[in-house]
Amino acid sequence: MSSGERVAKVVLVDIEGTTTSISFVHDVLFPYAKQNVEKFLRDFWKEDDIKHIVQDLKQVPKFADYKALLSAPPTEVDVELIAGFVRYLIDQDLKVTPMKTLQGLIWAQGYANGELKGHVYEDVPAAFEAWRAAGLRIAVYSSGSVAAQKLIFGHSLAGNLQPHLSAYFDTHVGHKQEQQSYENIAQQLKEDPKQILFLTDIPGEAAAARSAGLQAIILQRPGNAGLADDQKASFELIPDFKPLHNLKLPINKSQA
């Protein structure tokens, strides 16, 4: 099925490499979190939500591995230890939910004080408008926390895009290369999986979504990873959202 012939009721978008450049995430957001995590923890260490995040971080299996790497492991959990562990997780690109939650809080400060603006590709706002006008819902599924997702779209270079978005999903619903995650999303959206179109840059995510019954298209944005020949043969590939501007709702047979 070509892009121009597709119908759907929901467009489910990934962020990194799909709506937003990978370089923004890796070259702007991650370094900002690394640079500011220790100060943020010192400022809010006694707040209940931070205490809960710290407790969750201590339960991450990699926490013991990280402490074993230290020449002089501390006898108690303090700001410096947790900040170092978060920087370690970021460097390893490990998508750990409490770390993502903490990153989201740090980024919230950056967006609020104007130090950060969310990058979106120039074709994204027009696509969002077209899909909404056609009656489709738009949802987001990213490994970044829901809070972080809302910040990117709420403080984007194109302004506040949140009014276009009806739902957000992160790793609380499951990991992105697992079929069950997409089944969970379809259930939460109360939608037939085949009426959901998932847009991503990762073949493993597209395969997991398709195995759950969703439609899936892979974005080949500048800077995205190259694809093997079998991956190119398995999925429809598009360079941006423009081929999908005419996406429509399925025809209601009772009205046809």
Swiss-Prot record:
Per the record, the domain of life is Eukaryota
What's one GO BP annotation on this UniProt entry? Answer: L-methionine salvage from methylthioadenosine
Binding positions for Mg(2+)? 14, 16, 201
Keywords of this protein's UniProt record, alphabetized? Answer: Amino-acid biosynthesis, Cytoplasm, Hydrolase, Magnesium, Metal-binding, Methionine biosynthesis, Nucleus
Chain positions recorded as substrate binding sites: 142-143, 176
Position of the signal peptide: none
Q: Where in the cell is it found?
A: Cytoplasm; Nucleus
Cofactor comment text: Binds 1 Mg(2+) ion per subunit.
Broad class of where this protein is predominantly found:
cytoplasm
Instruction: Give the reaction(s) catalysed.
Output: 5-methylsulfanyl-2,3-dioxopentyl phosphate + H2O = 1,2-dihydroxy-5-(methylsulfanyl)pent-1-en-3-one + phosphate
EC nos? 3.1.3.77
NADP keyword on record: no
Q: Which GO terms describe its cellular component?
A: cytoplasm; nucleus
Alphabetized InterPro entries for the sequence: Enolase-ppase_E1, ENOPH1_eukaryotes, HAD-like_sf, HAD-SF_hydro_IA, HAD_sf
Assembly and oligomerization:
Monomer.
Q: Which family does it belong to?
A: Belongs to the HAD-like hydrolase superfamily. MasA/MtnC family.
What is the annotated role of this protein in its UniProt record?
A: Bifunctional enzyme that catalyzes the enolization of 2,3-diketo-5-methylthiopentyl-1-phosphate (DK-MTP-1-P) into the intermediate 2-hydroxy-3-keto-5-methylthiopentenyl-1-phosphate (HK-MTPenyl-1-P), which is then dephosphorylated to form the acireductone 1,2-dihydroxy-3-keto-5-methylthiopentene (DHK-MTPene).
User: What protein name does the entry list?
Assistant: Enolase-phosphatase E1
Q: What is the lineage of its organism?
A: Eukaryota, Metazoa, Ecdysozoa, Arthropoda, Hexapoda
